[in-house]
Structure formats: C-alpha cells, structure tokens
C-alpha cells in the first residue's frame, strides 16, 4: 500500500509540490534536482533491489566494515558511501538493512509521510536490558499509542512555551555558578587565566542543570567537593553509551548468553542509572510533598506526579530517560561550541557584541534578553550542523514510499545521514566554516530541512527546549565573562561512541573579560 493509500501518481504529485527547489550540482554523484527524490516521475518506480548497494550479504558487509575499523568512524563511512553511490543507497550490516538518504528534499518527503506515531530505530542493547530485567520504559523506547500518551503529557511539561519560562531562573543560576567554577580555576592556576580540559566540568554542569529542572533543587555538582554518588551517575551514562556500540550489529542476547564483559558493563551502567534515578526521584518527591507552598517552580517531577495523567511507573521511567539523556548530549555540544568559538575569534566577538547589547537592552529581564540573541541561537544550530549528537535520524516507513524513483516498501528503516548532510557543499556553502549567519537573513531560504540537530516533527528530542535554553544561557554567561582561546592550534577529529564526540581532549584557555564600565 502506498503512502496514505493514495495512488502512486497522486502521492508523487501532491507529495512533491511544497518541496521543489532549483537543481543543484552534487559533488561525487550525478547532477540532480535538490527535490528530485520528491518529484513526479512519468517512469515506473524502480524496485527496491536496484537501489545502489555494496551487496546483499550483511555478514560480508559487516566484516568489511569492521576490517576498515568503521565502528568509530561510521559518520565517515556514510560520507564515503554517498560519494560512491549517490544521494540514496541501501546497506545491510549483519541483520539490519537500511536505506540512507542525504538530500533535504528527500528528508522532507520522508517526514511528510511519517504518520501520527513515528517509529525510529531503538538501540538493541537498550531494548535487551529493559526486556530482560523488566524495566519500565518511557518515550525513548515506547511505540504507538503508549508512546503518544506519554509524549503528549511530556510536551505540556517540557516543551510548551509556558513550561520553558519556568526553567529560565533554574538554568540561569547554574550557568552563573559555572562562571564561578572557571574563576576558581583561574585563581588556582595563578596566571590570570585558566588553561585545561573542561570536559568533566561540562558533564557536571549538564547534570546539575537537568536535575534542577526535573527536581527543582540543586545537587551541588559545581561545588569544589562533588557528591561521589552523583558522579557515579555521570560515569554510568558514559559507560552505557560506550558499551552499546559493540552490540549494535550483533544480537545483544549473544553477549548476554556468554556473559561477556561488554554485556556485564552495560548492565552495570543501566543498573546504576536506574538505581540513582529511583533514589533521586523518591528523595526529592517526598521533600516536595512536605512543602505546602512553593515560592518557585517545583520541578518537572512534581508536576508530572501531581497531575495524575501518567502512572507513577511511567513518570519514573521518563524521568530516568531525561536524566540519562541530559548529560553527555548537552555537554558535548557545548564543548564543540567552545572549540569552534576558540577557532573563529571573529565569530566569537560578533556573538559577544550581540550578548552585551542584549544585556543592556533587556535591563535585567532574562526572558527579554533571550529574545535579543538570534545570532547566538544560530551559532548553536551551526555547532549541531558541524557536530551533531546523532549520526543519523531514523524512521520506519508506515507505508510504501517512492524516493528518487525507487519503491521503498513499508516497514523499511530509512536513515537520514545528518553528519554527512551537514558537511556536504551541495547543501551548505563552505561547509567546513563555522558561520552562524548562514541561518539568518537571506540565507534562511537555503536551510529547508537542514536544521535537524534535535530531530524533526512529533518525535523530535523531547528535551530540545530544555537543551536549547540551557546552552543559550551558558554561552551568554561565558561570553560576558571570558575570552575563549585554544591552548593548542590543532584539529580535533570526531569519533562515534553511540553519540558523536571529540576523539581527544580539547584544551581551552579562558581569559577574564572585563567590559569597559563606560560602555556598560
């Protein structure tokens, strides 16, 4: 059955009209219209088997993939395949077969027909752990109606504009305290500046931020002495990501049956995540229950448990997922942003000028200030273009769909190669350049279905608004207080560790920035 039960020609005509754009030359593959995959064709669609592919034997493909050490370089693997096969190809690795696309117009058509309850690829070891140990799942792993029920409730509490306003003071104080952390480091080094790798500090900042929003209270992760139990949660999240990678292309049950170290470490990581999240949830909730009046927003947990729209087990599962998803992801993006600002000092000065002007105009109103920093917000989009957290976005087709004259059957996994798209000159001019202005002004006409750092549609990242606000406030305070430079001018590569991250520590220099009081 074709998308939404329409006739093939009807689907192609109606599906392509809103998305058409001028033809564009794509390096490494034949000249095509940017919207050609979504366009009407008078030809009969070609069969799925004719989509360019390295071969149908998934195990041979997987052997070659491992032999080329593709596991940590899967984003480069995608880039090479698009250069070799063109803007659409299919690949089977082990038992998993996917169709990969890169053109924004094809992406637009994919999402147009994703259906009311989109289904994405679930990480196999995560599913195996939750099923084997009978752990409750939230929106991360739920499907269909169960997913939609949870998601609609969460949208009200974590995505709606009114909810976001409640988070501003909670996240702003954490960002202010991070400035204090850097000033302590400067004082400790005694050289008038701080030089070093702040990756661990960013992990703690991100965890302090997400816990403050969820529980309405601080954990003290930015104090000089950090609670070792809280640090265990941060370490467990990293281990959970790291141990997932070897089990992506082989059945996790094999690792479980043979009790491999990878599986044992993965289980230990998830156990820590669940145990700590349960402890935090219980402790903070009962503290809140004892209070009768609140001077400040009491946090997402209290709101979810208080509105009785979700069972307590569903609330706990979703809180656990938000805690686990709010550490490495945000901290990695901030680390990359600081790196790009340090490499592009002219951009950094443009951002600083905007922030300082916004502070003056807002006159102490943080909410108003957040509306006055479009370039800063664009710089976050630009960071996610160059350094997306996820290497792909995924959707299982609800119905048959025609892309680039190929018939793709229902239930096929289609993956949008986000990293490869962001680096392709066919879709971004000067793709290697950190240029936030490309997302503003006249350039906005060229960003159709290119801003995919948080996903798209009803199944986009549930923590998107929290993360965007958290990063914007963080960068505001950094730009107001420090000039950021690289300690060593060397390129930092990217590796795949379930999320994309730097392949080595990034050493930065923070110099105090003192605004001229006459200009303040």
Swiss-Prot record:
Q: Name one GO molecular function term.
A: iron ion binding
Q: Which GO terms describe its cellular component?
A: mitochondrial inner membrane
Q: Per the entry, which co-factors are needed?
A: heme
Q: Where is the transit peptide?
A: 1-39
Catalyzed reaction equations: 6 reduced [adrenodoxin] + cholesterol + 3 O2 + 6 H(+) = 4-methylpentanal + pregnenolone + 6 oxidized [adrenodoxin] + 4 H2O; 2 reduced [adrenodoxin] + cholesterol + O2 + 2 H(+) = (22R)-hydroxycholesterol + 2 oxidized [adrenodoxin] + H2O; (22R)-hydroxycholesterol + 2 reduced [adrenodoxin] + O2 + 2 H(+) = (20R,22R)-20,22-dihydroxycholesterol + 2 oxidized [adrenodoxin] + H2O; (20R,22R)-20,22-dihydroxycholesterol + 2 reduced [adrenodoxin] + O2 + 2 H(+) = 4-methylpentanal + pregnenolone + 2 oxidized [adrenodoxin] + 2 H2O
According to Swiss-Prot or TrEMBL, what is its membrane topology?
A: Peripheral membrane protein
**Which compartments is it annotated to reside in?**
Mitochondrion inner membrane
Pathways involved: Lipid metabolism; C21-steroid hormone metabolism; Steroid metabolism; cholesterol metabolism
The EC number on file is 1.14.15.6
User: What does the subunit comment say?
Assistant: Interacts with FDX1/adrenodoxin.
Q: What is this protein called?
A: Cholesterol side-chain cleavage enzyme, mitochondrial
- Name the gene for this chain: CYP11A1
